[in-house]
Amino acid sequence: MQNIDLISEEEAKKLLEELADKIAAYNHAYYIEDNPLVSDSEYDQLFNTNLKLEQKFPHLVLENSPSKKIGAKITNKFAKITHQIPMLSLSNAFDEQDVRDFVDRIKNFLRLDEFAPIFCEPKIDGLSFSAIYKNGLLTTGATRGDGYVGEDITANIKTIKNFPHKIDNAPEFLEVRGEIYIEKQDFLNLNKEQEEQGRDKFANPRNAAAGSLRQLDASITAQRSLKYFVYSGGVTEQNLASSQEQLLIKLKEFGFSVNEISKLTNSEEEIFTFYEYLKTNRENLPYEIDGVVYKLNDFALQNRMGFIARSPRFATAHKFPAIIGRTKLLSITVQVGRTGTLTPVAELEPIEIGGVTVSRATLHNFQEIMRKDVRIDDYVFLQRAGDVIPKITGVDIGKRPNDTIAFDTPLFCPSCNSKLHYAPEDIIIRCDNGLNCPAQNYERIRHFVSKNAMDIEGLGRKQVEFLIDKGLISNPLDIFFLKEKNDSSLTKLENMDGWGKKSVENLFKNIEQSKNVSLPRFIYALGIRHIGEQNAKLLAREFGSYANFIAQMELLSKNDLDIYQKLNDLEGIGDKILVDIIDFFDVKENTTLIKKLGEVLNIEDYKETREQSSLTGKIIVFTGSLPTISRAEAKATAEKLGAKVAASVSSNTDLVVAGVDAGSKLKKAKELNIKIIGEEEWLTLIKNV
């Protein structure tokens, strides 16, 4: 990853776009498919890089920034349930200094002179849930989903042993939130059963819990030994108690399972003592934990702290260090991605790390192999933190055989055998054979049908591979003629291995439904290099309709300078991305395919939707010292109400809130005749919004 301190604005734009796409894909795999693609530590590194870039270039923050998102978009398998208040993620702390910074932020935000008590709880590695009770009866259970909308798992949650279906002396309306998990021994037993029945084993206990809970047949869930802890009262918690400590006592009285291994701390030293205790004893616990959660204990102070887009300010998760293992590197395979990028993957002698068997690890890129001097038959060190594909951190040189040789970077594509293109500035190697490369064509079709693109459920990896191998599809357009081809064929798809009448009917129904698609999704589905969801939305907003989009792209490919400049002026689109767009539309097959898709699809014009309120979109500047609230708290409140907080006064400023010792900003506001109010007026204003 590039040095953030040295990165240019243009490089930052490109990197933020790449990070948004990559993290969104990892979120979908983790939250929806229950199939993590990268280690927790690697994910956290990418997420923190995104945050640092946004802090350095706040004007480049994307609409689909990972810092604004919580989980991943939900599937269509279960009914949707909207959470009354979002089920947010937590920010992370990785060392003692991060925790000290967290404590200092609380003090500064709330203007406290002394340590505010912090409640500490183990961070359970499971699946988050919400449960609603009305008049003491369990009526609804839901997953976290994307944080705002979850999946209805009411029938499944009722099968969990000791999960209350009825509560005595409960309020008229009650919500509880917590974590559903599977104990280590039950996980091993379940995997043994899976293996005996010829089914795929679960990668880790979290995947097993998530996969067991998200079953359409609740009787399957009932057969799994799921357990739970509650830790929150959701929308109702502040009606039940005045602190986190009191809340857990109350929830236990109602009959819920709460984690007894928790502690109210009154100093940083007590926090670190509790953390070390859990870190040392985690292997002795019957369930997996991956850190400690710290929450401001007082609910009134929590209310004042509030939230940022993705997480509460009053809580953080202190992660445990990754688990390290060592095993033999058997071989290095090379995968070819949708845009031709080659990625090396280490094939390993299976090793158990933290209760999970690992046989593959990412090597990221070929420079990484050279930098670490990783060789076949080496013994390598692995770092794992709740992941499926961990990271290789180094080589045990002392165990290296004498006859090993350095890994040769490939010269030809392993899929189509064409000569490879080296792009040292991108640290990548690419196959430029496009759709003539079987691997790229396969990945392009996979991308086209994916959840955030055309969203054709029933076309997973195996199905796409099968249809290509049988010659039933060779490009995205063929998908929409698959039913027609099947109807006229003597050998029906439903009679082939892996298919049945119902699955084929559902597939054709899903293909038909996907024909109605928004312009941003369609552009994203095309798989243009560096055009992720955010840039697809930018292009859709700029051109408005499919017809205008394709017409302008054809002009761009003919070097129309007006279109080039118009796109270059868009925030998020730069010279490098424009070159990728031009290269894509320079290929005649691409343009022909898009035009034919336009004939069979109903591509909806772009529509901008914005939620309006009296402060939405207003630009506000705070200056000087406010008597009773911190600037951070005032800014947070303004942003929560939809306003934009600026650092300087300009003709675009709508309102200036001035405190004591307001200086040049106040003077400039007067010169520009901008409305100026004090703290008292500000507090009245936000109270009435």
Swiss-Prot record:
PANTHER family tied to this protein? CHROMOSOME TRANSMISSION FIDELITY FACTOR 18, DNA LIGASE
* Required co-factors: Mg(2+); Mn(2+)
Q: What class of enzyme is it?
A: ligase
Q: Which positions fall inside the BRCT domain?
A: 610-689
Arranged from A to Z, the UniProt key words for this protein are: DNA damage, DNA repair, DNA replication, Ligase, Magnesium, Manganese, Metal-binding, NAD, Zinc
- Which residues carry out catalysis? K123 (n6-amp-lysine intermediate)
One of its GO biological process terms is: DNA replication
Q: What reaction does this enzyme carry out catalytically?
A: NAD(+) + (deoxyribonucleotide)n-3'-hydroxyl + 5'-phospho-(deoxyribonucleotide)m = (deoxyribonucleotide)n+m + AMP + beta-nicotinamide D-nucleotide
Under Gene Ontology molecular function, one entry of this record is: DNA ligase (NAD+) activity
The enzyme's E.C. designation: 6.5.1.2
Family to which the UniProt record says this protein belongs: Belongs to the NAD-dependent DNA ligase family. LigA subfamily.
Q: Please list the residues that bind NAD(+).
A: D40, S41, E42, Y43, D44, S89, L90, E121, R144, E179, K295, K319
The record's annotation in NCBIfam families points to:
dnlj, PRK07956.1
InterPro entries, alphabetized = BRCT_dom, BRCT_dom_sf, DisA/LigA_HHH, DNA_ligase, DNA_ligase_AS, DNA_ligase_CS, DNAligase_adenylation, DNAligase_N
Summary of the function given for this chain in its UniProt record: DNA ligase that catalyzes the formation of phosphodiester linkages between 5'-phosphoryl and 3'-hydroxyl groups in double-stranded DNA using NAD as a coenzyme and as the energy source for the reaction. It is essential for DNA replication and repair of damaged DNA.
Top-level lineage group: Bacteria
In which residues is Zn(2+) bound? C413, C416, C431, C437
GO cellular component labels: cytosol
Which protein, by its recorded name, is this? DNA ligase
